[in-house]
């Protein structure tokens, strides 16, 4: 059997390691965004019933536009959003992949503040987007001024802010997001992504970048 290094792999991908996360049998697994409570029986029964109905049409492709899901997500998020403001995919990583495919690529730059989610540079590498890493410092905190300075200096096409940050848990104020949006608009006219994968686990789940979406067409929240 041929090994990967024997195949015509892109030079920039040779020697790279795939993303991975420990899969441990432990009561609380914070690194994978899991709920520690089991699914209630009545919820499980409802899911099973709906799956059974769906199986009757499994010979056909599902709705490619995910309209029912997008409408439900818009209702859940509020902030005046409609299904037209929502995109759905197979997890947040696929959404981020789509963003890099559309707005990154050769000759373009992506900036994030490290340490942060280790999947970001992997997606950047896969799309041949230059990765710019800016250190958060000793307490892992960010300020509007610090964010603005980094963006204006490097002029990235994509900026991702993770809130609360993975793996440090550091929250991010809305003032930081507003500063980042203003800076990237001035610097490159690029895209600002706020990754809120752990937003519901934050100290105040009501504080979300979703509230900043109206009027900011280059702001995306995943």
Each model region followed by its residue ranges:
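N-terminal small-domain helix-loop-helix segment of the aminotransferase-like
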Residues: 2-91, 98
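Short beta-strands and strand-loop turn motifs
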Residues: 31, 131-135, 158-165, 192-196
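Glycine/Thr-rich phosphate-binding loops of Rossmann-like dinucleotide-binding domains
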Residues: 38-40, 96-97, 120-121, 168-169, ...
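Short acidic capping loops at alpha-helix termini that bridge into adjacent secondary structure
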Residues: 81-86, 107-109, 196, 217-218
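Short N-terminal helix/helix-N-cap motif within the alpha/beta-hydrolase-1
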Residues: 91, 97, 114-115, 202-204
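Active-site pre-lysine segment of PLP-dependent enzymes
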Residues: 142-154, 167-222
């Amino acid at each position: 059997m041929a090994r990967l290094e024997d195949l015509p792999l892109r030079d920039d991908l040779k020697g790279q390691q795939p993303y991975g996360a420990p899969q441990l049998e432990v009561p609380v697994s914070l690194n994978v965004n899991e709920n520690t409570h089991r699914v209630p029986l009545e919820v499980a029964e409802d899911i099973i019933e709906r799956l059974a109905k769906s199986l009757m049409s499994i010979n056909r492709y599902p709705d490619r536009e995910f309209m029912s899901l997008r409408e439900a997500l818009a209702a859940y998020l509020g902030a005046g959003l409609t299904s037209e403001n929502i995109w759905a995919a197979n997890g947040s990583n696929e959404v981020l992949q789509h963003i890099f495919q559309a707005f990154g690529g050769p000759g373009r730059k992506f900036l994030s503040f490290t340490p942060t989610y280790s999947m970001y540079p992997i997606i950047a590498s896969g799309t041949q987007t230059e990765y710019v890493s800016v250190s958060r410092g000793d307490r892992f905190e960010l300020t509007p001024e610090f964010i603005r300075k980094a963006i204006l200096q490097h002029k990235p096409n994509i900026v991702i802010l993770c809130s609360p940050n993975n793996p440090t848990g550091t929250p991010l104020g809305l003032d930081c997001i507003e500063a980042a949006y203003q800076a990237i608009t001035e610097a490159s006219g690029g895209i600002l992504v706020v990754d809120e994968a752990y937003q519901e686990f934050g100290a105040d789940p009501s504080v979300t970048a979703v509230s900043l979406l109206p009027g900011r067409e280059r702001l995306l929240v995943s």
